[in-house]
Amino acid sequence: MSPLSIVLLGFAMSTDAFAAAIGKGAAMRRPRWRDAVRAGLVFGCIEAITPVIGWMLGRAASDYLAAFDHWIAFGLLGALGAHMIVAGLRNESEVDEALRDTPKRYGLLALAATGFATSIDAMAVGVSLAFLDVHIGVVAAVVGLCTLSMVTAGVMLGRALGALIGKRAEILGGVILILIGSTILYEHLSGAA
């Protein structure tokens, strides 16, 4: 696999994470660069790990993973998207109270769940990489760095979008997550038909 192919693969594998990051950035009140980089690191690490896991599982697990990876991604993204829509429909006092009562680690767990949901199909890509002449460590590093940069940019781009549309930004973020999940499900089901 050529270096250019690896870089293109890295960017292609991070597009779902980029779209989710735009939604996340739009939903955040005032994301700072630190918030954007944190999201980029979480998504980048997860996106780098999942193809390695897939690569290790190899050909034996590919049929099993292909049978349900799209349902897992759809379910996680749908649930997170619905949660964001409900939160976006709450009035300000309910949102402030919920934020006060929500532990800090939930934010990281929700971020990690979104990162996993957008990268689960990367595991299947990792399975296919097991049959190619590639160094999985290099591929994982490139995928992780591409995702880090795209998610960081996506959160900040979402911030600008969020400033333009205000409270509806969280609803938009939820819709984006649901659309990503639905697209993943549609692509897998239409490919299987």
UniProtKB/Swiss-Prot annotation:
Organism domain of life: Bacteria
Coiled coil: none
Gene that specifies this protein: mntP
Family from the record: Belongs to the MntP (TC 9.B.29) family.
Subcellular location: Cell inner membrane
Protein name per the record: Putative manganese efflux pump MntP
Transmembrane segments: 3-23, 37-57, 66-86, 109-131, 146-166, 171-191
One record GO biological process: manganese ion export across plasma membrane
Keywords, ordered alphabetically: Cell inner membrane, Cell membrane, Ion transport, Manganese, Membrane, Transmembrane, Transmembrane helix, Transport
Membrane topology: Multi-pass membrane protein
